[in-house]
C-alpha cells in the first residue's frame, strides 16, 4: 500500500471518532506554515501503561501545501523520527482514554538515498536508522503531548507542543518555539500497519502563529463526542 493510499484510509478510519478533541482555532492568516507527515508508532511495553515508551517513524507526505521551507521532494526523502515519548498518566473511562506523555524528542531529516523502510518488528537494522540518516533539518523537544483514544473505535486524536532546539533549518525560522502537533491515529487493519507497530499516525506540525490557541475540551466533552 502506498503512503498516499494509506493516508486516505487513515483519514476515513478516523472519521468522527477523532473529531476535534483538541481543536486548533481557525485563522485568516495567509502565512500559516506547517508540515504534514504520516507513519507508524511502536512501543517498548503494553499500550496505555505508565512507563511505556512510544517511538514514531514517519515520512513527509508528498503534498505539502505551505511548507516551512522550500522542500526538495523530488530529490530527497524527508523523514520524521519521534523518540522517548514516555506515558506519564492514563485517565480511562470505559473505552475512552486520555494518555499524557513526558519527555520526547522529534527530528526531521532529509536524505537523497530515499531508503526509509517500516521493516516489521522494530527496533531493528532499518528502524530507526533509515529514518535518521541524511542531514538533520530540525531537532526538537516536546513540552507536552496528549493522546485521546477510543479502544472501541480504534481511533484517536493527538495534540502537543514542540520547541525546536537544533538542526540546519532552525536558524531560518521566525519562531522555533511552541509549535503545535495535531492529528489522528488509528489501529485499523486496512491501514497496512506492519507487524510489530502499534498505531498509524497522521499528524501535522504548525508554526506558533497559527493555529492558536489550542482548545482542549473537558473529559466529559471528549466522551460525549465519541458517543454521538
For every predicted segment, state its role.
Residues 13-22:
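Bacterial N-terminal signal peptides
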Residues 6-11:
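N-terminal export leaders
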Residues 212-228:
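Short acidic, low-complexity intrinsically disordered linear motifs used
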Residues 22-29:
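Bacterial Sec-dependent signal peptides at the C-terminal "C-region" and cleavage site
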Residues 29-216:
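Extracytosolic secretory-pathway proteins
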Amino acid at each position: 500500500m502506498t503512503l498516499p493510499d494509506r493516508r486516505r484510509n487513515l483519514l476515513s478510519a478516523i472519521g468522527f471518532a477523532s473529531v476535534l478533541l483538541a481543536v486548533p482555532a481557525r485563522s485568516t492568516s495567509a502565512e500559516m506554515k506547517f508540515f504534514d507527515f504520516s507513519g507508524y508508532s511502536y512501543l517498548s511495553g503494553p499500550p496505555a501503561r505508565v512507563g511505556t515508551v512510544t517511538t514514531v517513524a514517519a515520512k513527509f507526505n508528498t503534498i505539502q501545501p505551505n511548507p516551512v521551507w522550500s522542500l526538495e521532494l523530488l530529490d530527497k526523502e524527508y523523514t520524521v523520527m519521534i523518540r522517548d515519548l514516555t506515558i506519564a498518566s492514563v485517565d480511562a473511562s470505559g473505552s475512552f482514554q486520555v494518555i499524557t506523555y513526558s519527555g520526547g524528542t522529534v527530528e526531521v531529516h532529509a536524505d537523497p538515498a530515499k531508503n526509509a523502510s517500516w521493516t516489521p518488528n522494530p527496533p531493528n537494522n532499518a528502524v530507526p536508522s533509515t529514518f535518521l540518516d541524511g542531514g538533520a533539518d530540525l531537532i526538537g523537544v516536546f513540552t507536552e503531548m496528549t493522546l485521546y483514544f477510543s479502544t472501541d473505535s480504534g481511533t484517536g486524536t493527538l495534540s502537543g507542543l514542540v520547541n525546536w532546539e537544533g538542526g540546519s533549518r532552525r536558524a531560518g525560522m521566525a519562531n522555533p518555539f511552541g509549535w503545535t502537533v495535531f492529528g489522528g491515529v488509528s489501529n485499523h487493519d486496512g491501514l497496512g500497519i506492519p507487524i510489530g507497530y502499534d498505531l498509524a499516525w497522521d499528524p501535522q506540525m504548525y508554526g506558533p502563529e497559527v493555529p492558536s490557541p489550542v482548545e482542549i475540551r473537558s473529559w466529559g466533552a471528549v466522551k460525549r463526542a465519541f458517543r454521538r
